Amino acid sequence: MLIAVPLDDTNFSENLKKAKEKGADIVELRVDQFSDTSLNYVKEKLEEVHSQGLKTILTIRSPEEGGREVKNREELFEELSPLSDYTDIELSSRGLLVKLYNITKEAGKKLIISYHNFELTPPNWIIREVLREGYRYGGIPKIAVKANSYEDVARLLCISRQVEGEKILISMGDYGKISRLAGYVFGSVITYCSLEKAFAPGQIPLEEMVELRKKFYRL
């Protein structure tokens, strides 16, 4: 299980240093939260993360799934996906999916295909369909959904376990905190933690997750 820390560009160098010192494996660049989204600026941040020996997830979240509008979004994806270890694109952004799959495959990088629901955990058939669609497009499916009960958490993890392959599973909110650690047992390969601020409900602080990973998984 790899630990990712989402960062915007506020105090970027300082927070990057903290992320490395506290044990993060990956920095997720939340470009939709950047103050400057010009190509050269974002590229510099990507290169800065790599210079510290950490992997990167390039994320430019769409407004429909909790992000902000970035007018040069497609350009950034096309130019920077070959440089990032992972690129995160929403399943709903179908116009970009095939293009990004081809770009990342040619560059030897990985594509995360994400689905978000900030209100509830959807029915079982939707969970299965999202996973299968993610694999069909050649990526690692990521499901991040709001848990309104512990039953929601158990359902997401157990249903997802029935579909083979790498995946990322997140139950958001207080009920779902356990999924950020236990998801590994059910095939989840990356967990997201907070550094200075949480980018999603229920994120566990980085230092705490590093210790929990050592304690439970000896990783």
From Swiss-Prot:
Catalyzed reactions: 3-dehydroquinate = 3-dehydroshikimate + H2O
Signal peptide: none
A GO BP entry: aromatic amino acid family biosynthetic process
Binding-site residues, 3-dehydroquinate: 28-30, 61, 180, 203
Residues the record marks as active site: 116, 142
Pathway: Metabolic intermediate biosynthesis; chorismate biosynthesis; chorismate from D-erythrose 4-phosphate and phosphoenolpyruvate: step 3/7
Entries under SUPFAM superfamilies matching the protein: Aldolase
Keyword Lyase on entry: yes
Taxonomic superkingdom: Bacteria
One of the record's GO molecular function terms: 3-dehydroquinate dehydratase activity
Keywords, alphabetical: Amino-acid biosynthesis, Aromatic amino acid biosynthesis, Lyase, Schiff base
Keyword Amino-acid biosynthesis: yes
EC number: 4.2.1.10
Function: Involved in the third step of the chorismate pathway, which leads to the biosynthesis of aromatic amino acids. Catalyzes the cis-dehydration of 3-dehydroquinate (DHQ) and introduces the first double bond of the aromatic ring to yield 3-dehydroshikimate.
Family: Belongs to the type-I 3-dehydroquinase family.
Subunit organization: Homodimer.
PANTHER family: 3-DEHYDROQUINATE DEHYDRATASE (PTHR43699:SF1)
Protein name: 3-dehydroquinate dehydratase
Organism: Aquifex aeolicus (strain VF5)
Gene that this sequence comes from: aroD
